[in-house]
Structure formats: C-alpha cells, structure tokens
Amino acid sequence: MQISVKTTNEVKVLAFEGKLDTGTSPNAQQQLTRLIEAGENRFLVNFEKLDYISSSGLRVLLAAAKQLKGIDGELRICSLNEVVGEVFDISGFTTIFKVFGSESEALDGF
C-alpha cells in the first residue's frame, strides 16, 4: 500500500493506494499519528485507488478520529469505490464519518 500526502487549503489530503489491511495498517496508523502529533487536525482521506479495506484498516480510521476529536479536528473521507463503499455501509462507517463523492466536494467548506 502507498500513501501520498499533500496539503490543500490547510487540509492534509492522504491518498491511499492498494490494500489497507492487517499488514499495512500499522504504517497507515504511524503516518496519521505523526501528522496529528505535528499539529495537523484537518484530514481528508481519499480512497479512490484503495482496492480493499479490512477491519484493521477501519480501526486505523477510528483511532485517528478519536485523536482528532480531542483536539477539535476532523477526518473526512472521499471517493469510495464500490467494494470499499460496501464495507463502509455494512460496518456503519458512513454514519460515523462524513463521506463525499469527490475530493473537491469534500474540501469544499472544510
């Protein structure tokens, strides 16, 4: 899995590519934690190129959201494909996170 990071309008945009599972979740967690500890508190996670997410990947998102809640931050998600979108629907994550169809839509009004 690869994660690219860019900043758009003071929002850290993380684009995930590949699979977010048991093997790759620790790296994703470390990257998010490092950014949060550096003072970042607004994140957009773009899953356009994410092929698969496991329960370990979902836990990474929950942990980051919990950290951000304590510092008045926010984590938004965009560009879910059909497979990842189904996991979000079944797990109820679409009610936990703000999910947007595109990156530009998610950044609007952040």
Task: Describe these PLM feature segments.
Residues 98-102:
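Short acidic-hydrophobic, aromatic-tinged amphipathic segments that line or gate anion-handling sites
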Residues 1-15:
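Short beta-strand/loop segment at the start of cytosolic alpha/beta domains
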Residues 82, 104-105:
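Acidic phosphotransfer microenvironment of two-component signaling modules
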Residues 25, 103-104:
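Residues at or immediately preceding the N-termini of alpha-helices
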Residues 22-96:
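Amphipathic alpha-helical interaction surfaces in cytosolic regulatory modules
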